[in-house]
Amino acid sequence: MIAWLLSSFFVLLFLGVPIAMSLGLSAIGGILFLGGGSTVTIAQRMFEGMNSFALLAIPLYTFAGFTMSKGGISKRLMDFCYSIVGHIYGGLAHVNVLSSMIFAGISGSAVADTAGVSGMFMPEMVRKGYSKNFTVAVTAISSTIGIIIPPSIPMVVIAGICGISTGKLFLGGIIPGILCGLAQMIVSYFMAKKEGVPKEPGHFTIGPVLHGLWESWPALLMPIIIVGTITMGIVSPTEAGVIAVVYGLFAGGIIYRELKWEDIKFAFAETVRTSGRIFIVIGAAKLYTVMLTTAGFDKWVAKTMLGFSTNPTVILIMILLIFFIVTMFMESIATLTLFMPILYPIALGVGIDPIVLSVLITVVIGVGLVTPPVGMCIYVACDLMDVTVGEVFPTLVPFIAATFICIALMVAFPQLILLPTYLMA
């Protein structure tokens, strides 16, 4: 049974069959032809995977992000970030990263950040003398902060699968997101020096910063509202998503008065497409995971890993490597839905903190989003600038290396993840 499930899935995947279809067909084949259970379980298990109140936050945060990006915040956000870091060598690259860090607190999606706010920087960066490869690389890698700094769609999925507090996960992602952003800025500085990019004119002054802060305060306030209301126990993550939607409509339509009815229809359509794809993958992955568990795959994985080592750090590194490798070939949501139910109990069994594990997995998944052959963010960024992944990837390697250094620091010092939770407690 295990051999069929794994071999049929990977054959379908490499033939180009969509991930949800590959998972579903492999699982259904096991049920129909190998006696893996009743056909009644197909619909039951798929519905069971999607039937989670916590997962309702996904379309809500997605819609809020689209409405904020369409409601006039993008240009104001760019100006605010430029007033802070634009004077540093490689200024536009730093603005790109800082904007992604702020937009991460709005959308919770790396791909949305790549195609949205970060995508707006690329033509301007090329016009100012940045190479296309550098421009695409910094845009793709900075967008991965979108799933680390709260709110985060992958964290919502993890919380729904493992029963972890979404609020604690959101708090755990704050320092790692900032750390990864600073690392990307350091790499951007030296790469800009190497490329001989002209330095932006002017120097840091407080006036433009205060003006930019006044213009962009509605966007800056949203992540504070979301994380604050959740961690204070006022609302659940899903209810906070409703607040984010109402606030996004209010900010774009009333405060900025730039959100049009066409923009709302676009945001709604994109939310339906994005959320529909995610939920279909979650349902199919749930069915596939149940079949793997029925076949004893989880016990085999646990026996193999614990037979190699019972040291928590070693097990943690092994789990992170598994997620990194798998995310290179599969969508992040499918990877989480498949492997979290299998690997999470192993991690708990050796004493790994669930918040530390979940945040580190989220960061690793972000690296997978910019790593070929299936890195979604790198392909979106390359399409926007009409370059190939092969051309961009060598420029991307230093950014990936910097992210792995950040991961190593977090593995060595998990307090970087847990500190906000301790402070709130």
Segments predicted by a language model, with ranges:
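Alpha-helical transmembrane segments of multi-pass membrane transport proteins
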Residues: 1-425
